[in-house]
């Protein structure tokens, strides 16, 4: 009679469960990768997404699509996080990183079926990923930030897969100029928060323009007849209200005769006039007022006094804009009128309201860089909100590509060329290895071919023929041979100016390998109470 096994021990001996859990995890993650696979490359399709609030989005940006998808499986959510990590690190390649993760999980599934331990697979994948990064850096070409043409080509490649691809010759130089105006040859990074993208419906994408300064969507208050243009501006950014104070509790004041009424109005006038004179005394002539939900940020009487004192008033500045405006205008936010002093003001050559395609915007130009940080604004135009949102996302991707080149000044050919080259190198090196590692590296090498295969499929080409042709061209030493959709076949993509920053590819492979390692190490899912 066999010995009795306790319940906990039986669970430990049951080897089926971890395998089933891993299989379920891999299926869930690959389903996410397959869902966005058709949106890769210049001929990739767009997805229409209806959000929970009923808004419509049209995009082929991997991170945008995944962020909006209702994903319930916890492992599938890890792919959304990988896409988000790629978006914050490189800004581009968000679809590629998810497809690559899906392909590596497919390779891992085959290896698990052969009985190879998941930890060995995960660690071998990471070593292969590190080797892939070395190969990519080896085949990249160094560039200088002075070489504007190369930067424009890299930005154009990023825009080629978007709805706005026909405007890439216009938007790519715009993105390059925005980033270069904030950097110099010694810069190692650029903060994209210093580039303000302002969306305005109206006009076409061609009307998108860059402004060397700050653009505000709020209008100048004209109801009291104050100025709408100010040269040699001294700008104050206030967080207090210029209106009569309200009691903390709900109180009623009973007025018996007109003398008391007159006294209340006199008090109010004196209170507001004192605040306005204090502002004028500090030599402030442009006033930005934060939006208030408790009471009027500025009332009609205060506007009348400010217009008489020749002060431009812009009200309803959002709370989340305060930090940006403070940084870019060089002025400190003022929370109390007693703290309103000249040293807290920012300076600019000109503040004016202009009419742009039927909408009014406020431009602040010629900002004096004392303690101000250099910033640029970009007014994004589009026929409707759907086009406008996608234009903004596309422009952000192009800006991220240039930021990648500021961080790591090296370009590689696009169109699947780096993946084929890395795949070939890893496959060759795996033949010299012993044991299980050789198997794992071979599967890793084959998985990398998913990028050129998908590019060819989405372009309507014969993927088997194209990938086979690329392999033979790389074997004969053409390291930059990739897929050109324009030529409907293989070509030297570097000479065709299909370029991408090396950081996009290195980041994608590293993140994909790390994500696969995390997924393979999970052998059970339990739910907490």
Curated annotation (Swiss-Prot):
Domain of life where this protein originates: Eukaryota
GO annotation terms (biological process): chaperone mediated protein folding independent of cofactor; protein folding
Xref: Gene3D superfamilies: GroEL, GroEL-like equatorial domain, TCP-1-like chaperonin intermediate domain
Pfam families linked: Cpn60_TCP1
GO annotation, cellular component aspect: chaperonin-containing T-complex
Keywords for the protein's UniProt record, in alphabetical order: ATP-binding, Chaperone, Cytoplasm, Nucleotide-binding
Cellular location(s): Cytoplasm
Gene Ontology molecular-function annotations: ATP binding; ATP hydrolysis activity; ATP-dependent protein folding chaperone; unfolded protein binding
InterPro entries: Chap_CCT_delta (IPR012717), Chaperone_TCP-1 (IPR017998), Chaperonin_TCP-1_CS (IPR002194), Cpn60/GroEL/TCP-1 (IPR002423), GroEL-like_apical_dom_sf (IPR027409), GROEL-like_equatorial_sf (IPR027413), TCP-1-like_intermed_sf (IPR027410), TCP-1_chaperonin (IPR053374)
Subunit: Heterooligomeric complex of about 850 to 900 kDa that forms two stacked rings, 12 to 16 nm in diameter.
Family membership: Belongs to the TCP-1 chaperonin family.
Function, as annotated: Molecular chaperone; assists the folding of proteins upon ATP hydrolysis. Known to play a role, in vitro, in the folding of actin and tubulin.
Protein name: T-complex protein 1 subunit delta
Gene from which the chain derives: CCT4
């Amino acid at each position: 009679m066999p010995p009795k096994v306790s319940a906990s021990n039986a669970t430990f001996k049951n080897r089926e469960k971890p395998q089933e859990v891993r299989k379920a995890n891999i299926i869930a993650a690959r389903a996410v990768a397959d869902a966005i696979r058709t949106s890769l490359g210049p001929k990739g399709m767009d997805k229409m997404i209806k959000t929970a609030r009923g808004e419509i989005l049209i995009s082929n940006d991997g991170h945008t699509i995944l962020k909006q998808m209702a994903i319930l499986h916890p492992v599938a959510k890890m792919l959304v996080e990988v896409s988000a990590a790629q978006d914050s690190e490189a800004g581009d390649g968000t679809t590629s990183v998810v497809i690559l993760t899906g392909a590596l999980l497919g390779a891992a599934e085959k290896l698990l079926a052969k009985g190879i331990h998941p930890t060995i697979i995960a660690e071998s994948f990471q070593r292969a990923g590190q080797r892939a990064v070395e190969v990519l850096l080896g085949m990249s070409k160094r560039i200088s930030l002075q070489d504007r043409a190369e930067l424009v080509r890299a930005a154009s490649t990023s825009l080629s897969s978007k709805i706005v691809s026909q405007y890439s010759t216009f938007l790519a130089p715009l993105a390059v100029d925005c980033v270069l105006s904030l950097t110099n040859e010694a810069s190692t990074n650029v903060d994209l928060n210093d580039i303000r993208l302002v969306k305005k419906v109206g006009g076409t994408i061609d009307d998108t323009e860059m402004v060397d300064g700050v653009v505000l969507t709020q209008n100048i208050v004209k109801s009291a007849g104050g100025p709408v243009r100010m040269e040699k501006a001294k700008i104050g950014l206030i967080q207090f209200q210029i209106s009569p104070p309200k009691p903390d509790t709900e109180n009623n004041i009973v007025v018996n005769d007109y003398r008391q009424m007159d006294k209340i109005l006199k008090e109010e006038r004196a209170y507001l006039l004192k605040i306005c004179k204090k502002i004028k005394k500090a030599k402030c002539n442009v006033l930005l007022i934060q939006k208030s939900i408790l009471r009027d940020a500025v009332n009609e009487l205060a506007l009348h006094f400010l217009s008489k004192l020749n002060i431009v008033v812009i009200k309803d500045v959002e709370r989340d804009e305060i930090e940006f405006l403070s940084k870019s205008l060089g002025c400190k936010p003022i929370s109390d009128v007693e703290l309103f002093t000249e040293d807290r003001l920012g300076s600019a050559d000109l503040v004016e309201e202009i009419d742009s395609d039927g909408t009014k915007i406020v431009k602040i130009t010629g900002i004096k860089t004392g303690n101000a940080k250099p910033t640029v604004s970009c007014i994004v135009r589009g026929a409707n909100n759907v086009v406008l949102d996608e234009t903004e996302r596309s422009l952000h991707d192009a800006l991220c590509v240039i930021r990648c080149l500021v961080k790591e000044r090296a370009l590689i050919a696009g169109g699947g060329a780096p993946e084929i080259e890395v795949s070939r190198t890893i496959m060759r090196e795996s033949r010299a290895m012993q044991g299980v590692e050789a198997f794992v590296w071979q599967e890793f090498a084959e998985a990398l071919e998913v990028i050129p295969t998908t590019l060819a499929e989405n372009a309507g080409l014969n993927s088997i023929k194209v990938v086979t042709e690329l392999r033979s061209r790389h074997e004969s030493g053409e390291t930059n041979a990739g897929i050109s959709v324009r030529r409907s076949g293989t070509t030297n993509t570097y000479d065709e100016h299909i370029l991408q920053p090396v950081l996009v590819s290195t980041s994608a492979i590293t993140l994909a390998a790390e994500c696969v390692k995390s997924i393979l190490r999970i052998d059970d899912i339990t739910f907490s109470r």
